């Protein structure tokens, strides 16, 4: 049985994880930006609604 060269497999392994991580990060950042936009609007409303607790 011939021994396979591990270098291309390691490269492909990291390439696949890099692509998956990039796509996950892109999805995560899009979710975070939408939640940050929503929360920033809520914070503005809350700051007008409530005074400082102390």
Curated annotation (Swiss-Prot):
GO terms for biological process: proton motive force-driven ATP synthesis. The keyword Cell membrane does not apply. GO terms for cellular component: mitochondrial membrane; proton-transporting ATP synthase complex. The chain crosses the membrane at residues 9-25. Keywords: ATP synthesis, CF(0), Hydrogen ion transport, Ion transport, Membrane, Mitochondrion, Transmembrane, Transmembrane helix, Transport. InterPro entries: ATP8_metazoa, ATPase_protein_8. Its main location: mitochondrion. One of its GO terms (molecular function) is proton transmembrane transporter activity. Pfam families: ATP-synt_8. It is found in: Mitochondrion membrane. It is a single-pass membrane protein. PANTHER family: ATP SYNTHASE PROTEIN 8. Belongs to the ATPase protein 8 family. Subunit 8, of the mitochondrial membrane ATP synthase complex (F(1)F(0) ATP synthase or Complex V) that produces ATP from ADP in the presence of a proton gradient across the membrane which is generated by electron transport complexes of the respiratory chain. ATP synthase complex consist of a soluble F(1) head domain - the catalytic core - and a membrane F(1) domain - the membrane proton channel. These two domains are linked by a central stalk rotating inside the F(1) region and a stationary peripheral stalk. Component of the ATP synthase complex composed at least of ATP5F1A/subunit alpha, ATP5F1B/subunit beta, ATP5MC1/subunit c (homooctomer), MT-ATP6/subunit a, MT-ATP8/subunit 8, ATP5ME/subunit e, ATP5MF/subunit f, ATP5MG/subunit g, ATP5MK/subunit k, ATP5MJ/subunit j, ATP5F1C/subunit gamma, ATP5F1D/subunit delta, ATP5F1E/subunit epsilon, ATP5PF/subunit F6, ATP5PB/subunit b, ATP5PD/subunit d, ATP5PO/subunit OSCP. This is ATP synthase F(0) complex subunit 8. It comes from Branchiostoma lanceolatum (Common lancelet). The gene is MT-ATP8.
